[in-house]
């Protein structure tokens, strides 16, 4: 009977376990301390110790609870842990069963922020290759911000001043608090459902880390990254930053700066337009002067080598041959007249009437033959001259132009073969009545080589 008062190890351990279970102070315990001896096996559970300078508490957090915490616990991290105290019977010790954990103090938000930033950066959400180019001349700008804050006033004022023609559509949203992230994501989704928004601005004015936190939450950062509409993120003041700044296509230091990035200043555009107009006029004037010089050179070339000049030369040659022909004809007449005079003298000397008549007849025949020969020679010379003129007319470039042909120049140089041209060359084609400028878009060479 004496031995009935002894309890087994299991029994006393079970008793102690029951004591912890029924103790209301042990059912929900709030513990603050530093993590040490952290381990996470393949099961996904966390095994660690929560300690302070006076004591330590063995702790465990099961996998289901681990999945709900928004950061990665590390040794040396100060945390706030909620859970219950129980007994691990196999080891015969009490331990803390953690059900919720969060970093301790304001530094906890920075830890959570840095850990989420590292995770999203590893996934590629901040990569420059993903970022879209902002449109140069947007017609509609969407703004996701508070409808009562200074940010929306700054954005509207700046856009209206820089480009009054741009339509601004404000999507009012709460920018801090528990529901802020959800509302921001909803508005980004609404904007992407439209097909007329060119660029959107999301952001708010300055504030503390807690007040800006909605723009650090993962759903917002991912919605910005997934947006088909280019996004400008402008959260807080110049020294502030949010994770939405990194996933956005462009980060602006302030809401005013975001508006300046979203739309151009019409005064700058007017100056640029005037400058380009001046440059275009200068280039056009230079091109016109070059064409005028080229035309003048072509005129001089035609004057020296054209059919008119050739005709004048042929006319000079005709006059020269006509003069020679007249001289030869006059000489023949003179010779015949001299012979006639001699015969006439002889006739007077001998008075042979029959001989005189015979000589007169011969003289007449000779004169007729000579006249006929001279006329035929002159006719032959004229026909030859006109044939040469016709040949010159056919060889003249202007004659080719009249028949529908064109003369092609490249940089004021005559083009004689298609092999001298390449696709993309600018050419000038001289035609009857003027010329045209053309661009070579295709080229096909004759396979025969002709």
Swiss-Prot record:
Catalyzed reactions per annotation: Exonucleolytic cleavage in either 5'- to 3'- or 3'- to 5'-direction to yield nucleoside 5'-phosphates
One cellular component (GO) term of this entry: cytoplasm
Keyword Hydrolase found: yes
Domain of life the protein comes from: Bacteria
Main localization category: cytoplasm
Top-level enzyme category: hydrolase
Localization per Swiss-Prot or TrEMBL: Cytoplasm
EC numbers, comma separated: 3.1.11.6
Disulphides: none
Subunit text: Heterooligomer composed of large and small subunits.
Cross-referenced PANTHER family: EXODEOXYRIBONUCLEASE 7 LARGE SUBUNIT
UniProt record similarity statement: Belongs to the XseA family.
Job of this protein: Bidirectionally degrades single-stranded DNA into large acid-insoluble oligonucleotides, which are then degraded further into small acid-soluble oligonucleotides.
Protein's name in the database: Exodeoxyribonuclease 7 large subunit
Record lineage: Bacteria, Bacillati, Bacillota, Bacilli, Bacillales
Gene: xseA
């Amino acid at each position: 009977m004496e031995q009935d008062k002894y309890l087994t190890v299991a029994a006393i351990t079970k008793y102690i376990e029951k004591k912890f279970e029924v103790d209301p102070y042990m059912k929900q315990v709030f513990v603050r301390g530093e993590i040490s001896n952290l381990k996470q096996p393949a099961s996904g559970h966390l095994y660690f110790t929560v300690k302070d300078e006076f004591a330590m508490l063995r702790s465990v957090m099961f996998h289901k609870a681990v999945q709900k915490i928004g950061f990665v616990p590390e040794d040396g991290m100060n945390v706030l842990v909620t859970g219950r105290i129980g007994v691990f019977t196999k080891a015969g010790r009490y331990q803390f069963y953690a059900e919720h954990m969060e970093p301790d103090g304001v530094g906890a938000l920075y830890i959570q922020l840095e850990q989420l930033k590292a995770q999203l950066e590893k996934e590629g959400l901040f990569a420059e290759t993903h970022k879209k180019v902002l449109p140069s001349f947007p017609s509609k700008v969407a703004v996701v911000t508070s409808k009562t804050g200074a940010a929306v006033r700054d954005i509207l004022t700046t856009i209206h001043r820089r480009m009054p023609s741009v339509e601004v559509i404000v999507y009012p949203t709460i920018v801090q608090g528990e529901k802020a992230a959800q509302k921001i994501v909803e508005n980004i989704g609404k904007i992407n459902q439209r097909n007329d928004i060119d660029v959107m601005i999301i952001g708010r004015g300055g504030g503390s880390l807690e007040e800006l936190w909605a723009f650090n939450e993962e759903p917002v950062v991912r919605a910005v990254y997934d947006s088909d509409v280019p996004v400008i993120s402008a959260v807080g003041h110049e020294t502030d930053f949010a994770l939405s700044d990194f996933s956005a296509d462009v980060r602006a230091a302030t809401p005013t700066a975001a508006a300046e990035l979203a739309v151009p200043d019409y005064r700058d555009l007017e100056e640029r337009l005037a400058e380009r107009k001046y440059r275009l006029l200068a280039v056009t004037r230079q091109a016109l002067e070059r064409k005028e010089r080229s035309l003048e050179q072509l005129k001089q070339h035609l004057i020296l080598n054209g059919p008119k000049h050739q005709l004048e030369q042929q006319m000079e040659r005709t006059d020269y041959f006509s003069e020679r022909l007249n001289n030869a004809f006059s000489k023949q007449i003179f010779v015949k007249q001299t012979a006639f005079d001699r015969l006439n003298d002889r006739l007077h000397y001998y008075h042979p009437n029959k001989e005189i008549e015979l000589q007169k007849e011969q003289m007449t025949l000779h004169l007729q033959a000579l006249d006929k020969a001279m006329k035929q020679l002159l006719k032959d010379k004229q026909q030859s001259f006109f044939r040469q003129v016709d040949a010159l007319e056919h060889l003249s470039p202007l004659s080719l132009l009249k028949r529908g042909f064109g003369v092609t120049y490249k940089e004021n140089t005559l083009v004689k073969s298609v092999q001298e041209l390449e696709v993309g060359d600018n050419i000038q084609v001289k035609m009857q009545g003027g010329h045209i400028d053309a661009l070579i878009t295709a080229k096909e060479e004759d396979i025969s080589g002709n």
